């Protein structure tokens, strides 16, 4: 039996690259430069790296910066100073001897850094010698000050800053323009702002009269609106009526100092002023120069010059002497607005015209469509204007030949009456043939409506139910 003499196994400290990747044991060769046994069997290239993975591991060394003279400058130990202000020792490190050192780099050849502040032998920055010496804590390199400071105001336009530290000399310290000034931390003031002190508000010179937001409103005196009758009517002093100027147009209102004893006097004065303004502002128009606008207790109504003086229900009279006097021309402009043939008709009765315009005698159907009915509960005062065309239309309807059934008003109990047939219904019934018309019988069962049923505050639903119940109890024969 033969025995192989392989020799002792050689152990290497570093494996080849192939064995390291395969994580197998690498046995080196006795001859330098020869591959290992594993690579020889595999006929692979055996390569040993010059720098192994263990060589990459470096032990932790103290931070140092290379110097020009080849020496190593080790960082000095920091002095343990308590943090008494927002500017702690981390922002401004100090050595054990109390001198200020650089906060960024500590190399002698690092002057290219813009944030680097070179340190002199005395331990202070040359660019901040004058500014740091003005502070009591930094004078003659005595180290940081022990009293916490609180900046009051930092002005961006000037380099002066006032601080409250309890000393008068520190309040007037002057800081030079430097990068350190922009890096200072400004802490908020712990004292609240005194809003009642005169220093917290701008002076009177800064307040301009043209600025509405900064100007202080003046007090308004209501003594001009006081009157002897204001004791009985307190609302007249609180809400004074505006006096309308008579010489201007409609838009030029002037606040007057007159007061009125009640609301009716105020309305009467304002309506008179509006009527006078309307007459003066329309005098330059040639088409309206023939009319005379007269003011009364209410709005003055413009009526036709050809109408009778008693036909106007609002109280406006027609001045026949002033017709064709203001215009100065012979052309009758009223012929373009009205139909003169209907007014000058010989068959037209004056009593019919008077009855059609008299609201007190015949309130049903005599209300003009353009007439405004206001204040029904107090006095049923009618205000408005009547044109020339409306006068001729009412004159045609009052002739007794044609005319639709006018709308009835249920606001007052006096307007509803069933004791006599309506004349409008009889006039319309005369147009129908006799065989299709049943004579309307007057109702004597109900003379007038109950005043409690209809009032000025009655809704439409209440009137509807009342009429429906009344029709069921009293049927009315109608024409088909």
Swiss-Prot record:
One of its GO terms (cellular component) is cytosol. SMART domains: GAL4. This is Uncharacterized transcriptional regulatory protein C2H10.01. Residues 298-307 have a biased composition (Low complexity). Signal peptide: none annotated. Coiled coil: none annotated. It holds the Pfam family Zn_clus. It is found in: Cytoplasm; Nucleus. SUPFAM superfamilies: Zn2/Cys6 DNA-binding domain. InterPro entries: Zn2-C6_fun-type_DNA-bd_sf, Zn2Cys6_DnaBD. The keyword Zinc-finger does not apply. Residues 16-46 bind DNA. PROSITE patterns: ZN2_CY6_FUNGAL_1, ZN2_CY6_FUNGAL_2. Residues 308-325 have a biased composition (Polar residues).
């Amino acid at each position: 039996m033969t025995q192989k003499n392989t020799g002792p196994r050689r152990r290497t400290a570093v494996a080849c690259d192939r064995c390291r990747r395969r994580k197998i044991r690498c046995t080196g060769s006795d001859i330098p430069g020869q591959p290992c046994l594993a690579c020889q069997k595999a006929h692979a290239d055996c390569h040993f790296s010059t720098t192994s993975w263990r060589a990459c591991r470096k032990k932790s060394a103290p931070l140092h910066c290379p110097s020009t003279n080849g020496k190593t400058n080790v960082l000095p130990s920091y002095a343990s100073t308590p943090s008494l202000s927002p500017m702690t020792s981390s922002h401004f490190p100090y050595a054990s001897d109390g001198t200020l050192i650089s906060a960024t780099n500590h190399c002698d050849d690092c002057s290219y850094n813009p944030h680097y502040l070179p340190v002199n032998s005395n331990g202070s920055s040359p660019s901040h010698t004058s500014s740091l010496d003005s502070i009591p804590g930094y004078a003659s390199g005595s180290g940081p000050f022990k009293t916490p400071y609180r900046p009051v105001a930092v002005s961006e336009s000037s380099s002066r800053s006032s601080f409250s530290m309890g000393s008068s000399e520190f309040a007037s310290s002057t800081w030079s323009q430097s990068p350190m000034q922009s890096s200072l931390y400004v802490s908020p003031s712990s004292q609240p702002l005194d809003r009642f002190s005169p220093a917290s508000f701008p002076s009177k010179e800064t307040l301009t009269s043209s600025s509405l937001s900064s100007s202080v409103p003046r007090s308004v005196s209501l003594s001009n609106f006081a009157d002897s009758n204001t004791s009985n009517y307190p609302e007249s002093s609180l809400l004074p009526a505006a006096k309308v100027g008579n010489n201007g147009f409609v838009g030029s209102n002037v606040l007057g100092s007159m007061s009125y004893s009640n609301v009716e006097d105020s309305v009467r004065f304002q309506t008179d002023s509006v009527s006078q303004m309307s007459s003066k502002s329309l005098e330059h128009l040639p088409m309206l120069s023939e009319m005379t606008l007269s003011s009364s207790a209410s709005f003055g109504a413009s009526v036709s010059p050809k109408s009778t003086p008693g036909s106007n229900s609002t109280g406006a009279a027609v001045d026949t002497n002033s017709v064709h006097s203001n215009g100065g021309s012979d052309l009758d402009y009223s012929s373009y607005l009205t139909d003169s043939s209907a007014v000058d008709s010989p068959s037209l009765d004056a009593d019919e015209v008077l009855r059609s315009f008299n609201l007190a005698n015949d309130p049903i159907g005599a209300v003009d469509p353009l007439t405004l009915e206001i204040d029904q509960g107090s006095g049923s005062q009618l205000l408005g204007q009547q044109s020339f065309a409306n006068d001729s239309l009412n004159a045609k309807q009052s002739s007794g030949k044609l005319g639709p059934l006018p709308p009835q008003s249920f606001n007052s109990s006096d307007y509803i009456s069933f004791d006599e047939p309506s004349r409008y219904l009889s006039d319309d019934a005369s147009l129908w043939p006799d065989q299709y018309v049943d004579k309307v019988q007057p109702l004597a069962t109900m003379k007038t409506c109950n005043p409690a049923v209809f009032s000025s505050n009655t809704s439409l639903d209440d009137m509807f139910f009342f009429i429906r119940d009344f029709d069921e109890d009293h049927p009315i024969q109608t024409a088909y």
